[in-house]
C-alpha cells in the first residue's frame, strides 16, 4: 500500500509539474513573442496583451514584437481566403478588387462594425476611407484583380503603438485608440498621385487640442505625419495621405491646467501694466496738445493716440471678461463677447492704419495729401468693426468659450466665439490682411533705414543700435508681435512669448512715444537716416 501510495503521490506531482510547465508559455504576452500563428487563440491573447503591455512588471512584453505582429497581420489576411474578421478588438474586410475600376471606392469604418463598401446612392459614412481609382490602375504588373485589406484595430490603453513621442507628450492620445490599416496586394504603395482619404468623426475638441493625421513608421517605431495632410472639419477630420499603411488621428493638448492658469495670470498682469503705461501715454499726449503746436496739426501723434485708446479699451474688456463669470444670462455673455470682439478689431484696424500712414511718409512720400485725413481714418477704424460685429452677432456666433486640459477639466471660460467659422473669418482672416500689409511696409521701411546711412555717408557701415530700436518700435505699432500666432508653430514656448509680448504692447508704445517725442541733444543733431525717418513720421497730412 505504501508503494502504491508513493506511486500515486509521484504520479500526482508529475502531473502537477507538467501542468505548471505547460501553463507558462500560455502567458499572453510571452506567447506572442514566439511566433506569428494568427489563429483565434493568438488574437484573443493579443487583446489582453495590449492592455497589460508595459503596465505590469510581471507581464513580459516586447512592444516591438507586438507591433510587428500586427503589421504582418494584414499580409496574412491577403494571403488567405477569409473575407472578414470580426473580433472585439479587430475588424477587417478583405476583397478582390478589379484594377480597372471606373470610380473611387468608399468604405464605411463605423465603430464596432466590420468595414463595408458603400455603394452608389448611399449616404457618406461619418467614418470612412476613400480609395482613388488611380491607385488600382497604377499598380505594377498586368493584373486584372488585386486583394484589398482594410483593418480597424483597437490598440487599447497600453503602450503598444504609442511610440516615444506619444509616451513623452503627457496627455496625448490616439483618437478612440483606433488604427486603420490599408493594404493592396502586399505592395509598398507610396507617392500616390491621388491621396487616400480617411475620415475620423469625433466630438468637438477643446481649442487647446491639436488634431494631427499620422501613420505608423515601421522603421522608426513611432508615429510620423510625413506625406499626410490634416483637413479639420465640423465634428470630423479628414486625413489625406500619399501612401498605404496604418493610420490614426493623434490628439495633442497644448495646455494643461497649471499652464493655462499661469498664462492667464501673465495676461492679466501684462494687461494691467499695459493699461498703466497707455494711460501715461494719453496723459502726455494731452499735455503736449496744450504745450506744443505740432501736436494739434500733425496726424502721426493722433494715430498713435487712437491706437493707444483702442488698446487700453481692449485690455480693459479683456480683464473684465476673464474676471467675470460666464454662467450669467446668455445676453450678458453675448454683449461682453461682442464688445471684446469690437475693440480687438479696432486694434487690428489701427495697426493697419499705422502701417498705411508709414507707407505714405516713408515709401510714397509725394502726393500724399488727403482732405480730412484723420477723420477718414477714424471713420474707417471705428466704423468697420461695427459692421463685422453686427454680422457675427446676427449669426449667433457669440457665447461661452471653454478651454479644457488633457483630463477634460475646464481651465478657462470666457465670453467669446462659440462657432469656429465665424472666429476664423472675422478674427483670423481680418488680422491676416492687416498683418501682411504691415509686414510688407515694415520690410520696405527697414530696408530704407539700414541702407540710407551708408548711402548718404558713402560708407559701408552697419546698422546702428538706434536703427534697430526704430524698427522694433515700428514693429510694435503695426502689430508684428501678433504674427507669432500665424507664422510660428503653435507650441508651448510660442504661447508664452506671444502672451508676454502682446500683453505688454502698451509698454512698448509708451517707450516708442517717449523716444520719438523726447529726443536727446545728440539725437536732434544726428544726421542719420533714422532721425530723418522720425522727422518724416511727423509730417502733417492736413
Swiss-Prot record:
Residues 213-257 are annotated as: GPS. One of its GO terms (molecular function) is G protein-coupled receptor activity. Disulfide bonds join 213-239, 228-241, 333-415. Forms a heterodimer of 2 chains generated by proteolytic processing that remain associated through non-covalent interactions mediated by the GAIN-B domain. In the inactivated receptor, the Stachel sequence (also named stalk) is embedded in the GAIN-B domain, where it adopts a beta-strand conformation. On activation, the Stachel moves into the 7 transmembrane region and adopts a twisted hook-shaped configuration that forms contacts within the receptor, leading to coupling of a G-alpha protein, which activates signaling. It is a multi-pass membrane protein. Residues 246-254 are annotated as: Stachel. Glycans are attached at residues 44, 96, 142, 408. The record marks 244-245 as: Cleavage. Cortisol binds at residue 502. Residues 19-267, 324-342, 394-426, 489-494 are extracellular. Keywords: Cell membrane, Disulfide bond, G-protein coupled receptor, Glycoprotein, Membrane, Receptor, Signal, Transducer, Transmembrane, Transmembrane helix. Residues 1-18 form the signal peptide. It comes from the Eukaryota. Present in all these tissues with a relative high expression in the heart, kidney, and bone marrow. Also expressed in intestinal lymphatic endothelium. Autoproteolytically processed at the GPS region of the GAIN-B domain; this cleavage modulates receptor activity. Heterodimer of 2 chains generated by proteolytic processing; the large extracellular N-terminal fragment and the membrane-bound C-terminal fragment predominantly remain associated and non-covalently linked. Interacts with PRTN3; this interaction induces the activation of PAR2. Interacts with GNAO1 (when palmitoylated). This is Adhesion G protein-coupled receptor G3.
Amino acid at each position: 500500500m505504501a508503494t502504491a501510495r508513493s506511486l500515486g503521490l509521484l504520479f500526482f506531482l508529475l502531473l502537477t509539474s507538467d501542468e505548471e510547465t505547460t501553463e507558462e508559455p500560455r502567458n499572453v504576452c510571452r506567447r506572442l513573442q514566439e511566433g506569428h500563428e494568427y489563429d483565434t487563440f493568438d488574437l484573443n491573447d493579443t487583446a489582453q496583451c495590449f492592455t497589460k503591455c508595459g503596465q505590469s512588471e510581471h507581464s513580459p512584453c516586447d512592444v516591438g514584437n507586438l507591433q510587428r505582429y500586427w503589421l504582418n497581420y494584414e499580409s496574412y489576411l491577403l494571403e488567405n481566403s477569409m473575407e472578414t474578421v470580426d473580433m472585439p478588438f479587430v475588424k477587417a474586410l478583405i476583397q478582390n478588387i478589379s484594377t480597372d475600376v471606373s470610380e473611387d471606392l468608399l468604405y464605411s469604418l463605423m465603430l464596432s462594425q466590420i468595414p463595408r463598401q458603400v455603394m452608389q446612392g448611399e449616404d457618406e459614412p461619418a467614418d470612412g476611407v476613400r480609395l482613388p481609382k488611380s491607385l488600382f490602375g497604377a499598380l505594377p504588373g498586368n493584373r486584372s484583380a488585386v486583394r484589398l485589406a482594410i483593418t480597424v484595430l483597437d490598440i487599447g490603453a497600453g503602450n503598444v503603438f504609442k511610440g516615444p513621442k506619444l509616451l513623452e507628450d503627457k496627455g496625448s492620445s490616439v483618437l478612440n485608440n483606433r488604427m486603420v490599416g490599408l493594404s493592396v496586394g502586399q505592395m509598398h504603395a507610396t507617392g500616390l498621385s491621388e491621396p487616400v482619404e480617411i475620415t475620423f468623426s469625433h466630438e468637438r475638441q477643446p481649442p487647446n487640442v491639436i488634431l494631427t493625421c499620422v501613420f505608423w513608421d515601421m522603421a522608426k517605431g513611432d508615429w510620423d505625419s510625413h506625406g499626410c495632410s490634416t483637413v479639420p472639419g465640423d465634428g470630423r477630420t479628414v486625413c489625406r495621405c500619399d501612401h498605404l499603411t496604418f493610420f490614426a488621428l493623434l490628439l495633442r493638448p497644448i495646455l494643461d491646467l497649471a499652464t493655462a492658469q499661469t498664462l492667464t495670470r501673465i495676461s492679466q498682469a501684462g494687461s494691467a501694466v499695459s493699461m498703466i503705461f497707455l494711460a501715461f501715454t494719453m496723459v502726455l499726449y494731452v499735455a503736449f496738445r496744450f504745450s506744443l503746436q505740432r501736436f494739434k496739426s500733425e496726424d502721426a501723434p493722433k494715430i498713435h493716440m487712437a491706437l493707444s485708446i483702442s488698446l487700453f479699451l481692449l485690455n480693459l474688456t479683456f480683464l473684465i471678461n476673464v474676471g467675470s463669470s460666464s454662467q450669467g444670462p446668455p445676453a450678458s455673455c453675448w454683449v461682453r463677447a461682442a464688445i471684446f470682439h469690437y475693440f480687438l478689431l479696432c486694434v487690428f484696424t489701427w495697426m493697419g492704419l499705422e502701417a498705411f500712414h508709414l507707407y505714405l511718409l516713408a515709401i510714397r512720400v509725394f502726393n500724399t495729401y488727403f482732405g480730412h485725413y484723420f477723420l477718414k481714418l477714424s471713420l474707417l477704424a471705428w466704423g468697420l468693426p461695427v459692421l463685422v460685429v453686427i454680422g457675427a452677432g446676427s449669426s449667433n456666433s457669440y457665447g461661452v468659450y471653454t478651454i479644457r486640459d488633457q483630463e477634460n477639466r475646464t481651465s478657462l471660460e470666457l465670453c467669446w466665439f462659440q462657432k469656429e467659422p465665424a472666429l476664423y473669418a472675422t478674427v483670423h482672416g481680418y488680422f491676416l490682411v492687416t498683418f501682411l500689409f504691415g509686414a510688407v511696409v515694415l520690410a520696405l521701411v527697414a530696408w530704407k533705414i539700414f541702407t540710407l546711412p551708408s548711402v548718404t555717408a558713402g560708407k559701408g557701415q552697419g546698422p546702428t543700435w538706434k536703427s534697430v530700436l526704430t524698427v522694433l518700435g515700428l514693429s510694435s505699432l503695426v502689430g508684428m508681435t501678433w504674427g507669432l500666432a500665424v507664422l510660428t508653430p503653435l507650441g508651448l514656448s510660442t504661447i508664452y512669448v506671444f502672451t508676454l509680448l502682446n500683453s505688454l504692447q502698451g509698454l512698448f508704445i509708451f517707450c516708442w512715444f517717449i523716444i520719438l517725442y523726447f529726443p536727446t541733444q545728440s539725437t536732434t543733431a544726428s544726421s542719420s537716416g533714422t532721425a530723418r525717418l522720425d522727422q518724416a513720421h511727423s509730417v502733417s497730412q492736413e
